[in-house]
Amino acid sequence: VCVAAVACAVGAYRFVYLPLRPADVSHARISINATGKFDESQIDGAVKADLAKLKSWNGCRVDAVRYDAKRSATLLAAERDVTASGGSSSISTAIDEYGMDNVIYLSNDISCRAGSQNSSQDGWGSWYAWNPGSARAEHGWIFIDEGY
């Protein structure tokens, strides 16, 4: 009876509790490679907003959040160029609305456990726009989109 109770408890923990709890962001490694576009407090705010957003990845762990100013600028320019011929995306709309100098890209590494399976999302991107006066802003940043 004790073995069955322990097995049930372990199963409930692994298959019910873990998948439903908010993502663990407490051990995320933060890496910043900035060039002056945003000040330290703005970048810190973007990271905090991103970690708060990533908590919705129930049952996962955020391993790393990275900001690289050059990579962010390259991806923004590429997005602008791809949509310049008449296309549109959430990122290009944010560039039009907030200005290219107010949009940031963060890269995230996330590990998830689904039952007995582990998976990882390395390089998962998050896009934010700096608009501290907005009621929608968290730490001064408005979430725009996420993905690869």
Placement of each model-derived feature along the sequence:
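Hydrophobic H-region at the start of alpha-helical membrane spans
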Residues: V1-A5
